[in-house]
A protein has these predicted regions:
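Carboxylate-rich, polar loop motifs that coordinate divalent cations or form catalytic acidic clusters
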Residues: 1-230
Length: 230
């Protein structure tokens, strides 16, 4: 890994993140950093190969969650996603947990039977209807309400290979765009049918990059593809 660097937007200079403890210096210079996400209090959450870090930028303090001092499942922390209620969804190599902002703790014992908390989840996304979508390393698209009282596998993707889903984003018209390793799909949240976009539609390459989908302030969608940015 190459650690984590901080960009100064005024000078365009880069420097290594150096706010961790003495034992964390090597991680932030040479270790594996998988994701960096802000919460509603402007803390930065950093998923790494050595656990989960929460950095308070105002106080310049950092907290380190591991499987030894919390209910964080073991392994690499691949995804951190905060929903519209402020709750944090944490996905690791071996499963999931939830960050409860009220108790400021991680909890892995809150999931109902049949949920995806034991799978390797790589992407978690909330749409404007407050539905959550989980993209696993293997398996179909999984969707749930914020309270986990209703959840299911999306049967529309049952014909796709298990490892084909890469990223997801919603456009301003309510369509969900799902990037795969064999093209780009567009679906309606309530529908079970989809439109497929391939080379004939201007997609430069069939394979999209894991987790690389973004909607900007103008509503334009951006996707990472092995042939470049589209």
């Amino acid at each position: 890994g190459g650690g984590m660097m901080v960009l100064n937007p005024e000078t365009l200079s880069l420097k290594y993140f150096a706010q961790g403890g003495d034992g964390d210096a090597e991680l932030f210079q040479k270790g594996h950093i998988f994701c960096v996400r802000p919460d509603e209090k402007e803390n930065l959450w950093i998923g790494t190969s050595q656990g989960l870090f929460c950095y308070n930028r105002q106080a310049k303090q950092i907290k380190h969650f591991t499987s030894a001092n919390s209910q964080l499942p073991e392994g690499n922390v691949y995804e951190v996603s905060f929903d519209s209620t402020g709750k944090g969804w944490i996905a690791t190599e071996t499963g999931m947990c939830i960050y409860d902002p009220a108790s400021q703790s991680l909890r892995s014992n809150v999931f109902p039977e049949g949920f995806v908390h034991r799978d390797k989840v790589r992407t978690i996304y909330e749409d404007t209807g407050h539905n959550l979508y989980f993209i696993r390393e293997k398996g179909s698209l999984f969707t749930s309400t914020l309270t986990m009282d209703r959840f299911r596998n999306r049967s529309v993707f049952s014909t796709l290979p298990d490892n084909s889903l890469m990223s997801i984003v919603e456009d301003n018209q309510g369509w969900l765009w799902v990037a795969c390793n064999d093209g780009l799909l567009r679906i309606k949240e309530e529908g079970e049918e989809y439109d497929a976009f391939t080379f004939n539609d201007g997609v430069p390459g069939p394979t999209f990059t894991n987790g690389a989908a973004y909607k900007d302030e103008k509503g334009i969608l951006w996707f990472g593809n092995t042939k470049g940015l589209i």
